[in-house]
């Protein structure tokens, strides 16, 4: 089995070393606010990677952490008007993330460790780094502990970048402005339960050490893949790697990074006020359509979110899914049982995914198959071949964008669809009679998305096309 992936560390395409299993660690969310589409795009990409590996017969041990203690979470608690504590916010928002993952068909990780459950492990790791003289207690006598970049000559190997962010550099007590925090001393403004006792006094861990510790605890000192968003490359992943190497770990063989999400050509950021929450996106399109949208750009490319591109992707997905339901219904009406099989996935499909997880290219192959199925139904061609093609398409989508099998295009479903259609048509007529042309046009557009044309009281049906 060969799977080639782009490795950020070596800056080239490398072949995954497929041992008995593939270990995958992905940096999860800091749970201070509800999930946005950038979080979910990353989650969907790594879910596709996991599904593809498992389809190829490789067991995957998948770990995705949750950062449930952080300055941002504490700031959210201070600014909230509901009186929620920081840990209540972390618990609630963690639930929102898991609901979003579930809605988008992202399989849960094997382990989802919380930072707050691993404080003793983190303290032990910091003690080892101090013993190795690559970390030190703050020079100003405070309880802060820093990692010494000067003591780790290979620092910067992941991104070829050595200068830290300005906010990190101004912390007092450092030997070198570039050194970064391993342990943060408790502040007078910190709320109750937001600190732990340590050899350096009460405080909490720095962000970067958390992932180094949890990744090696669950996956060992050497594992296959470390993933995350491109925004985490520096300083987070650079610091993670430095800490792990200083602790004696090889760490990840391959570093993967998903591209950023822009909104109307501008980087999505809270500071710009243009973050698109998952719940808002899901108010416009179905979960499967949103997942499909995330996959229309290569995982390393920037995805430019626009209302128009989301709508187009939704229409494309609805037509694709509509074709599948159409074929299911056609085969059932022709008396064919669903006993078709897939002996081997399309070679080009497999090659695309093996080539740095080229999902857009793989989706193009799915669309070609969908067009072929429509032609086979229209010409009433070989039913066995049609059924096998349908099974192959469903199999391919089970890796990329699973079909919701709770929605089936059976005869009973057709009856329900007719009843629903009648309700929509009557609602449109009522809106027109009241002069509510906005609602009337909206209902007509919704019907058009299902290939149902309404004009002057006449209704016509088209065949869904992929």
Swiss-Prot record:
Its cofactor is Zn(2+). The keyword DNA repair does not apply. The gene is cysS1. It is found in: Cytoplasm. A motif ('KMSKS' region) lies at residues 267-271. It comes from Tropheryma whipplei (strain Twist). It catalyses: tRNA(Cys) + L-cysteine + ATP = L-cysteinyl-tRNA(Cys) + AMP + diphosphate. A motif ('HIGH' region) lies at residues 29-39. Keywords: Aminoacyl-tRNA synthetase, ATP-binding, Cytoplasm, Ligase, Metal-binding, Nucleotide-binding, Protein biosynthesis, Zinc. It holds the Pfam family DALR_2. GO terms for molecular function: ATP binding; cysteine-tRNA ligase activity; zinc ion binding. This is Cysteine--tRNA ligase 1. Its EC number is 6.1.1.16. It comes from the Bacteria. Belongs to the class-I aminoacyl-tRNA synthetase family. Zn(2+) binds at residues 27, 211, 236, 240.
